């Protein structure tokens, strides 16, 4: 990431996209870039969680209000200068994506509407679902 960012001017807007999400729409990309330009902060697309969720601790598990959960997608979009500074932070296991690195550096993260079809293909079942979406022109 640092090598790529070193080639980008500080005032540019940069998007980081997960190659495992091949169905990202022009609308989501445009929405993320517009918001990053307008607000000069980190922008990430999200969708609502529809499943019931539980929080686990070492001692118990409890139901958690899914209305407070959002599922993060890509692209994650930032002013390049902010992201360059954030990536000077030494790596930690808590960093799960670019937004978590940026947030740790004090960068505000704004959520925008994602797209359910912007699926992440990480398992054989995901791949079969993606093939179905593509074959039946549902994307």
Show which residues each predicted segment covers.
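Residue-level signal for inorganic ion chemistry
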Residues: 4, 17-18, 48, 79, ...
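A short, conserved beta-strand element in the Rossmann-like catalytic core
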Residues: 20-23, 118
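Conserved core of the sugar-phosphate nucleotidyltransferase
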Residues: 23-112, 139
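Active-site nucleotide-sugar/metal-binding loop of Leloir-type enzymes
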Residues: 2-13
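Hydrophobic helical membrane-anchoring modules
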Residues: 118-139
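Conserved strand-to-helix beginnings and helix N-cap segments that scaffold or border functional pockets
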Residues: 1-2, 26-30, 124
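Conserved Class I S-adenosyl-L-methionine
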Residues: 110, 114, 118-120
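Short beta-strand-to-loop acidic/aromatic patch adjacent to the donor-nucleotide binding site
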Residues: 11-21
């Amino acid at each position: 990431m640092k090598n790529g960012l070193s080639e980008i001017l500080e005032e540019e807007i940069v998007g980081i996209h997960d190659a495992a999400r091949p169905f990202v729409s022009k609308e989501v990309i445009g929405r993320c870039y517009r918001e990053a330009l307008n607000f000069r902060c980190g922008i990430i697309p999200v969708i609502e969680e529809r499943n019931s969720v539980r929080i686990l601790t070492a001692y118990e598990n409890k139901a958690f209000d899914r209305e407070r959960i959002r599922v993060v997608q890509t692209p994650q979009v930032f002013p390049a200068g902010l992201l360059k500074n954030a990536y000077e932070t030494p790596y930690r296991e808590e960093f799960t994506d670019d937004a978590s690195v940026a947030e740790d550096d004090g960068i505000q993260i704004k959520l925008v509407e994602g797209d359910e079809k912007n699926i992440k293909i990480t398992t054989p079942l995901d791949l079969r679902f993606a093939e179905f979406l593509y074959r039946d022109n549902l994307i």
